[in-house]
Amino acid sequence: MLKMVDGVVLVVDAYEGPMPQTKFVLQKALDLNLSVIVCINKIDRPEARPADVIDETLELMMDLDATDEQLDCPFIYASARGGFAKYKIEDPEADMSPLFETIINHIPAPEGDPDAETQVLISTIDYNEFVGRIGIGRVDN
C-alpha cells in the first residue's frame, strides 16, 4: 500500500510514544524514501509528554538509519478529538490548518499528465451503505 503514496503522516500518541506498528510503518516509509510528517496526537490529554515523544521518535528514526534529510521532517502537534493542530506546542488552539498546510508544503505533488485521460490504479474495493461500492486507489492522471 505504501508504494501508492507520495508521503506519510506518521501519527504518534503524545503519551504512549512510538508503538511497534509505528516502527514497522516508519521503516517501510524510510526504505521507500517517502516524505514523512510526524503528527504528535492527543496533546490535549493531561498526561501528554510531547517533548519526550519527539525525542523517542527521532531516536527511532536514527535506529532505522534515516538520512539527515529524513530526520529533518516537520513535527506537528494535534488533537484529533479537539479538532486542532499546531506548529508549536505553545501556539493557540484553532483548527487543523497547520496539518493541512504542512501536507501541502512537504508532501510532493503527484506526477502525471494533467492533459491525459484520467487513469486510476484501484487497489482496494470497499462498500459503504450510503454510496455503495467504492474503489480506493491512486490517480495517476
Predicted regions and their residues:
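Amphipathic alpha-helical segments in well-structured domains
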Residues: 22, 50-57, 96, 100
